[in-house]
């Protein structure tokens, strides 16, 4: 069962995220979801700012120094933290979104409606990018496919945001009890003992 608290703050949301990292069952409240997304966004901005500073310094050094002095593979080492951070958070973000969707009464598999069009957009987009870089011929079919999947992806993205923002189903649903409701297990146990 997912552990959650009624009055959640950013620190509690981060703790719950890591505690429930592999937990795709149960429910996550809106505050649990959005507080963690805010903290994820803040860390991403900090990492991105550091990478921007290093990128600017590297480009500046390349302009005024010998660009061949450092091997290219080592020159951009500072881009690794953002990739590592993104990949390290991926499963946890999927499980958190699944629990948030389940809190609303939707299956966590709804995420595929957002992921699949994104992948299907990326395939023709990379084909177009490759033809531009290599000087190959333009493929109008790839452009049409990228446009169609981009529009579908935008629509499913908006739908996901709406689902993630809507209030939870009250009390219980098939994924468990509303995490914002007070825990009545102790109250029920005490009342049973009094009878």
What is the meaning of each model-derived region?
Residues 109-119:
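Central hydrophobic cores of alpha-helical transmembrane segments
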Residues 1-40, 93-109, 161-195:
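Membrane-interface extramembranous regions at the lipid-water interface
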Residues 44-86, 117-156:
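Membrane-helix interface segments in multi-pass membrane proteins
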Residues 4-12, 69-95, 104, 109-110, ...:
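Selective recognition of hydrophobic, aromatic-rich stretches within alpha-helical transmembrane segments
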Residues 40-43, 114, 129, 187:
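Single-residue recognition of alpha-helix boundary sites
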